[in-house]
């Protein structure tokens, strides 16, 4: 709830719509490690209007909100560039005014995120099927996001972010494979899915 609230306060309702569980996990992780001053409160929202929900906000909440917005912004841009999805164009344009401030606050992180997403995009255009390569690129993005600062925790945080990023990429590919086949969209698992029965495919992915 704290992340949702800060997304709305910092970036408006459109920012609030970018809420993700991976950035929520990042807040919990960084807060547990660094034990920053945290402000506890309560809030109501459209999703749960009848009762107040507890919120906890600290510097990592704002950081995660910024990273959340950057990832969503580039995703929307890619949707427009690759598939000419009008929703992607509209969403990217709506988020654009907020992006410049994030770029100035976290220039190195934004630069790496943008570079890796561009790399992913280029491989997608080539129809790359190397799962480890593709998942690893998104893992690099999450590794950079999870590394809050160069300190004793940095290496461990990068490892957590990297492998979580790989898992997220693979799970998204697995869940979207049938939809992507129907839409003729890129998915590194398409070839494997088409060569097997759904049951065989599911079993192989689980193992």
Question: Over which residues does each language-model region extend?
Answer:
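Acidic catalytic motifs of isoprenoid enzymes
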Residues: 1-159, 166, 170-206
């Amino acid at each position: 709830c704290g992340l949702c609230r800060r997304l709305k306060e910092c970036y408006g309702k459109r920012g609030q719509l970018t809420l993700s569980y991976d950035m929520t996990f990042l807040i919990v992780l960084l807060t547990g490690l660094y034990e920053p001053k945290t402000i506890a409160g309560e809030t109501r929202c459209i999703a749960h209007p009848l009762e107040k929900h507890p919120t906890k906000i600290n510097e990592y909440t704002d950081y995660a909100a910024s990273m959340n917005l950057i990832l969503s912004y580039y995703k929307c841009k890619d949707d427009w560039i690759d598939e000419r999805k009008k929703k992607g164009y509209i969403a990217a344009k709506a988020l654009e005014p907020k992006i410049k401030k994030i770029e100035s606050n976290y220039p190195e992180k934004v630069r790496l995120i943008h570079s890796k997403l561009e790399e992913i995009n280029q491989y997608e255009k080539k129809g790359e099927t190397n799962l480890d390569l593709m998942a690893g690129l998104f893992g690099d993005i999450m590794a950079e996001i999870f590394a809050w600062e160069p300190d004793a925790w940095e290496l461990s945080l990068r490892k957590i972010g990297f492998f979580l990023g790989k898992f997220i990429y693979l799970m998204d590919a697995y869940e979207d494979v049938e939809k992507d086949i129907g839409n003729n969209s890129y998915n590194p698992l398409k070839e494997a899915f088409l060569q097997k029965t759904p049951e065989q495919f599911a079993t192989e992915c689980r193992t």
